[in-house]
Every structure is written in C-alpha cells, then in structure tokens.
Amino acid sequence: MHDATPLSPERQEELLKHLEDVAHRHERASEIRPDQLQALDRLIKVAQGCTGQSALLANFLLAWQHAPEYGGFDLKDLWGLDFELREDAVAVLGMIAYAQRSPESLGYAEAFGRIARAWREGDPDF
C-alpha cells in the first residue's frame, strides 16, 4: 500500500485557488451574453432566406433544436459561410455548449418553427 504524502498548506491553498478559478470560469461561461443572442438573431434572419448560406444555417440551427428529427450538422459546412456569419455561428456554438439551453427555452420556438417548415416541410408561405 502506498502512503500518500500530505500536501503542504501552500499547495493546499494553491489547489483551492485553482478549483475556485475553474468554478468561476464555468459559471461565467454558462451565462448567455447579449452578443451571443444578437449573433443568434442574425443567423435566424439569414436562415429564413433562400440562399446557400441560408440552407447551411438552417441545418446548423435545426440540428441544435432536434438533430434526431432534423438531421445533424457537418462542422465543415461552416467553411461555406461568409466570415461574419461564421463568427456568429461560432458565438452561438459557444452559447449552446456552455449554457446548455434549447432554442425553445430562450424564446425562439416560433422562429425555429418557421425555419423547420421552410427547410424541412417545404412550406410555400415561408
């Protein structure tokens, strides 16, 4: 059996500080920032269009909403976006990863419904 060497008070303090820093970063990362919501609004607006970039963004957003129903998203498709839209997609991806919230929980059910009807159901009134 291996005897563990006790940590010095300095090392204990250092580890505690590190854990507090990690917890603080996690807490901050899970907060949704206004710039992320603005990026999401811009992506939704483009996804409601009828261009190639609109189709890519519809796939991206609908994969977030419900990938088993609407299909996944190939991350290499981000390469097909203009720089500004790619930056917005990365901001939204960060929000998705850290905030762990669905579009519906953020008040976007109606907008995502319009995108789904247009791109998955061929709604002529889109």
Regions found by a protein language model. Name each.
Residues 36, 40, 53-58, 86-89:
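Short runs of predominantly hydrophobic/aromatic residues within well-ordered alpha helices
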Residues 49-53, 67-70:
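Alpha-helical structural elements of signaling/regulatory helical domains
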Residues 56-67, 91-95:
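Short, hydrophobic/amphipathic alpha-helical patches that form generic packing surfaces
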Residues 70-126:
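Polybasic, proline/glycine-rich intrinsically disordered low-complexity segments
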